[in-house]
Each structure stands twice: as structure tokens, then as C-alpha cells.
A protein has these predicted regions:
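Helix-loop-beta junctions that constitute the ligand-sensing/allosteric loops
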Residues: 30, 50, 85-91, 97-99
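Regulatory nucleotide-sensing modules
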Residues: 5, 9-64, 71
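A short hydrophobic beta-strand segment most commonly corresponding to one strand
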Residues: 97-108
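A small-molecule sensor/coupling module
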Residues: 4, 20-22, 82, 87-89, ...
Length: 135
């Protein structure tokens, strides 16, 4: 796979970050592989330790056992839990063999504090609330 910072630079909210800054933010990111059915985050479980990004494959975002979104490469998850320190409101489960990157909490907060990051959080939260009928 290409360098993580090059991959991320194609997707919001990373696409608005200067290349050198993005490279520094992701230098300590961990890459994880998952088999179909593996859970990464558990609804009402431990808070997210950072910002997750799907690199390959796809992940199901579930609320109360129902799939409300399929996360594809370039999409983030765990940000509401990471930002609040609260338990995740959703379970995230590998739909197929998948790979994800985990950015540290500090790096995730820095990414999401940009104008593009704030817009990304608002957009994803609105979409998820609509899909769960909580608007």
C-alpha cells in the first residue's frame, strides 16, 4: 500500500492538511488487520483510543445491532467517542477482511480541529443521527 499520508490526503478531513503536517500527524499511526466479523469498537464499550480510518475492505457501523452505514476506505470512525471520552454509540465490525489505521488521540484531535475536520464531524454525526431516527 502507498504511504499512509499520501492515501489519507485524498479523503476528507485530511485533504485540507499541508503534506508535511499530515506526514507528521500520521508518523506514529498503527495499522491493524481484521477478519470479517471482528469488532473494533463496541457500542457502550471502552472509549475510542484515537481516530480510526478504513484503509482497505469495509466496516459495518451498527447501532443496536442494525447496520446503519458501511464504512469504505478513507472514512473515519471513533471520533465522537474519542472527542468526548464517552463510550461509543456504535459498534464497528469488519464486513470483510479489512485494514484500518489508528491515529493517536492527539493526532486525531489536531486533524478534527481544522475547519475541514469540524465540517467532517458535523456531516458524519448528522448522517448517523438521521439513519438512526434520532433527529
Amino acid at each position: 500500500m502507498e504511504n499512509l499520508h499520501t492515501f489519507l490526503a485524498r479523503y476528507p478531513p485530511f485533504d485540507g492538511i499541508e503534506p508535511d503536517t499530515l506526514r507528521a500527524l500520521v508518523q506514529d499511526a498503527e495499522q491493524h488487520s481484521y477478519e470479517a466479523g471482528d469488532q473494533v469498537l463496541v457500542e457502550d464499550g471502552l472509549p475510542a483510543p484515537g481516530l480510526w480510518v478504513v484503509l482497505a475492505g469495509s466496516m459495518d457501523l451498527l447501532h443496536e445491532g442494525e447496520v446503519i452505514q458501511v464504512l469504505e476506505p478513507g472514512e473515519c470512525f471513533g471520533h465522537p467517542s474519542m472527542l468526548t471520552g464517552m463510550a461509543p454509540a456504535y459498534t464497528v465490525r469488519a464486513r470483510e477482511p479489512s485494514a484500518c489505521a489508528l491515529l493517536s488521540e492527539a493526532a486525531g484531535r489536531r486533524v478534527l480541529s481544522t475547519e475541514a475536520g469540524v465540517a467532517y464531524v458535523a456531516r458524519t454525526m448528522r448522517r448517523r443521527l438521521v439513519r438512526t431516527g434520532q433527529t
